[in-house]
Amino acid sequence: NYYSNSIAFGNAFIGWNYKVLTENLHTCTLAEGCDYVADKIHDEADREVVSVLDKILTESGYTRKKGDFNEGPSVRYYCGKSSVYDYALNSDTGNLYLELRIRNAEKCLAYLRECPESIVEVFRHSDAGCQNRMNGTCRYGVKYEFEKEEKWHCGCCGAPFKLHPIKEDIPHYLKLLELGRSK
């Protein structure tokens, strides 16, 4: 039974899984691979994004591992033997998000001219950071200047750049991470 207490509390997000409706609460199967996230996504186009991006990344040599962040299940993609993921696909109460571990946003800025407005908007956004930024001990935040304003993306609790992915924009996500992967 996949809904035993240990599984239920290890993956309390089973309630978002459509399989609860097609199977039942006590026999609902939990998916493996990228379907671990896709099964919790409500939109068919978003499930397709998960599948397409997973195929591209795994065929490019990335290693896929399950992860659960605070808001829902995730699948994380690691390059080589790195202990830090480059990409993550997250289901936040059924909404899909892609995390990009861009460490040097400055290297991405020229390429943004080729990107759709939805991606450019992610770089316009700035967040306040967490307590580590406030006390001067942050090692993972990304600071850059965009459109003559200083921007900040906290990277302490996840990858600094988070967006709702669109299938047609996948090549842009890959290129942005390629450009901004290293400091």
What are these regions (language model features)?
Residues L53, L163-P165:
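Phosphate-binding beta-loop-alpha motif at adenosine-nucleotide cofactor sites
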Residues N5-D86, D92-N95, H125:
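Charge-rich, low-complexity N-terminal segments
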Residues D68-P160, E168-K183:
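Short, conserved beta-strand/beta-arch hydrophobic-aromatic motifs that form part
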